[in-house]
A protein has these predicted regions:
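Low-complexity, intrinsically disordered Ser/Thr/Pro- and acidic-rich segments
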Residues: 34-40
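Serine-esterase "nucleophile elbow" of acetyl-processing enzymes
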Residues: 43-94, 104-110
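Alpha-helical cap/lid subdomain in secreted, periplasmic
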Residues: 104-236, 240-253
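Short, solvent-exposed loop/turn segments at secondary-structure boundaries
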Residues: 65-69, 99-101, 228-231
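Intrinsic-disorder-associated, low-complexity terminal segments enriched in Asp/Asn/His/Tyr and depleted
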Residues: 19, 26, 34, 46-49
Length: 253
């Protein structure tokens, strides 16, 4: 932009001193054209260096159907808060299996940053054993939890391994605890489910350490009931906070 500003000043000087020799005017015109080409190349270079962020996962990102018509989804918040380019591959309802089967193959090769938020639906499919009325020891419950999380762990690590094959920055989002206390379906296991959420997040942090990628802790972002559109989906407010966290990360890496 500085070069464009200089070009404008050059033109002003040319108009003010129009009585200069023709040869000087021609040299000034040639210099102006050169500076114009330089400024154009600079603008094109800036566009090439623009962040291109791919968003993978589930409804934590693909939350458009859960916000009001006048409200913004996570992707819309991202686009409103920055000039970066965003490619949403995340799909409401998807699991780690779906990311492996449907999302990875669609990754743009030009992605400079990748954000992954997955695992919540996998967890929802497994926590119903906590509703079991049979009496189990703490040891038995923990053993069941570990067994149920094992295949999720394997798939999650495979996803991150595949993401790491491309030369780009990676951000893994943890799974938040949700607003389960206000939901009749989950209220009776709201506290017990936090243990499984913590176990899944341990997998995420461990995977991040293995592949040397970053983590965004969603439990520090979704902190109030207003952050949720329902017990488990981000609201307009929560989505805005998530978008801010993602943009801060893009700027920092």
């Amino acid at each position: 932009m500085e070069k464009i500003h200089v070009l404008q000043k050059t033109r002003q000087r040319k108009e003010t001193h129009g009585d200069r020799k023709t040869t000087q005017s021609n040299r000034g015109s040639t210099g102006s054209r050169n500076r114009t080409r330089t400024a154009t190349r600079k603008r094109k270079g800036d566009s090439l260096n623009m962040a291109y962020v791919s968003l993978l996962g589930d409804s934590i990102i693909d939350n458009k159907v859960y916000v009001q018509p006048h409200e913004l989804s996570v992707k819309e918040h991202l686009e409103e808060q920055s000039e970066y380019m965003f490619k949403q591959l995340a799909v409401d309802g998807h699991t780690t299996s779906d990311v492996l089967s449907f999302q990875l193959d669609k990754l743009p090769k030009l992605s400079t940053h990748k954000v992954l938020s997955i695992g919540g639906n996998d967890l929802l499919g497994q926590i119903y054993f906590l509703k079991n009325k049979e009496e189990f020891t703490v040891k038995e419950v923990m053993e069941q939890a570990v067994c149920k999380l094992a295949p999720i762990k394997d798939r999650y690590r495979t996803i991150v391994q595949n993401l790491s094959l491309q030369d780009s920055k990676i951000l893994l989002c943890t799974v938040y605890e949700g607003n389960l206390l206000d939901d009749s379906l989950y209220s009776d296991i709201a506290f017990a489910s936090k243990a499984m959420v913590s176990m899944l997040n341990d997998i995420i942090f461990s995977t991040a350490a293995t592949y040397k990628v970053d983590v965004l802790e969603l439990r520090n972002i979704f902190t109030t009931p207003e952050d949720y559109a329902n017990p488990i989906e981000p609201s307009h407010k929560g989505g805005k906070k998530l978008a801010s966290g993602i943009i801060e990360w893009v700027k920092s890496v």
